[in-house]
């Protein structure tokens, strides 16, 4: 959609690209949903808790949920600076993968000795996510349809074959599909081959998952305060004191689940680099458009480039695709 001008300075948008974006809405697709729950009250005054969880994304929500399930008498409080699921947990492609190493190839390269254990734990983790969704009746549009890792360049076909050989050495029986088999699943002439991971990836509505976990926590008695930023944590005898704009919390234990927002423990800044990409979402496909695309298995799709692109269908049959700028 963009090309550089003759001097190689700022790119110029083509008329066709401009027209294609004329009716686009620059918003977060998942969070802009009519099922979004109303915000919970902010913390006002002083409270105490056995465990204080800072951050209302997936990590914080699951920490609070597991802590309460493990000990129903434990007093658990969760605070979120904005609203639950507002940041990365509500702004992603909705691929729920079993890999703990951001892909098996990455795991084989960096953790070869631990790879088998990491893969086993990752599968158990994905099973646990599905079990939690089922147990608490969370309507997160969870579809365990798997993923196609797709070669779109000749060199990627060779890389795919080598990757399959390495997986076989670790006891995995990878399913490789040639050009014709891949295009039979999704009708794209650019697809040259693929690996089909039928069970290791699920699709999910990210925001609905966060909101469902929020409700599960509330049902178990977790106190949740939204629009409550923790501005400072200090030691306080046998516990910790958390300062907020309109109140404070004294906690025996604190779990920081703040992802890239590391200011409460500044030394973490040396270990975390925020990474982002963009997604676009179409209008719902018509039956004729769905027939033209194929994709009856509703698998997640991702190409094999280092700065890869990914594609998926939503519950109402829109195509969501994303990748790095």
Where in this protein do the model-derived segments appear?
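Active-site substrate-recognition segment that forms the wall
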Residues: 94-96, 127, 135-143, 230, ...
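Glycine-rich FAD pyrophosphate-binding loop
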Residues: 68-91
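Extreme N-terminal leader/targeting segments of oxidoreductases
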Residues: 1-51, 69-70, 74-75
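Glycine-rich active-site loop/strand segments that organize a redox cofactor
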Residues: 91-120
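A non-catalytic, amphipathic alpha-helix used as a structural packing/dimerization or gating element
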Residues: 113, 117-131, 162
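Flavin (FAD/FMN) cofactor-binding and adjacent substrate-gating region
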Residues: 17-26, 31-33, 102-108, 131-212
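Helical element adjacent to the flavin cofactor pocket in flavoenzyme catalytic cores
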Residues: 158, 165-168, 194-252
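Glycine-rich Rossmann-fold phosphate-binding loop(s) that bind the pyrophosphate
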Residues: 55-59, 81
């Amino acid at each position: 959609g963009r090309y550089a001008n003759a001097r190689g300075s700022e790119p110029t948008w083509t008329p066709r690209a401009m027209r294609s974006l004329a009716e686009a809405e620059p918003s977060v697709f998942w969070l802009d949903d009519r099922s979004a729950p109303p915000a919970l009250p902010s913390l006002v005054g002083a409270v105490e808790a056995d465990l204080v969880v800072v951050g209302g994304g997936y990590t914080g929500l699951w920490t609070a949920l597991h802590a309460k399930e493990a000990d129903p008498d434990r007093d658990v409080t969760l605070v979120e600076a904005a609203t639950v699921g507002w940041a990365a947990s509500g702004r992603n492609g909705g691929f729920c993968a079993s890999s703990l190493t951001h892909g098996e190839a990455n795991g084989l390269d960096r953790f070869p000795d631990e790879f088998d254990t990491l893969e086993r734990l990752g599968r158990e983790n994905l099973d646990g996510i599905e079990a939690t969704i089922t147990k608490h009746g969370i309507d997160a549009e969870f579809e365990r349809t798997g993923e196609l890792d797709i070669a779109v360049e000749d060199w990627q076909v060779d890389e795919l074959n080598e990757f399959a050989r390495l997986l076989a050495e670790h006891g995995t029986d990878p399913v490789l599909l040639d050009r014709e088999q891949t295009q039979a699943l999704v009708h794209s002439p650019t697809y040259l081959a693929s690996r089909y991971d039928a069970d290791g990836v699920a699709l999910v509505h990210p925001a609905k998952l966060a909101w469902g976990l929020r409700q599960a926590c509330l049902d178990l008695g977790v106190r949740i305060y939204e629009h409550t930023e923790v501005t400072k944590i200090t030691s306080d005898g046998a516990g910790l004191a958390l300062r907020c704009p309109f109140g404070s919390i004294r906690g025996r234990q604190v779990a920081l689940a703040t992802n890239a927002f590391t200011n409460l423990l500044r030394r973490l800044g040396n270990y975390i680099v925020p990474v982002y990409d963009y997604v676009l979402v179409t209008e719902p496909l018509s039956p004729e458009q769905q027939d033209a695309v194929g994709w009856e298995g509703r698998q997640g799709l991702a190409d094999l480039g280092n700065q890869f692109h990914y594609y998926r269908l939503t519950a109402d049959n829109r195509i969501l695709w994303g990748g790095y700028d």
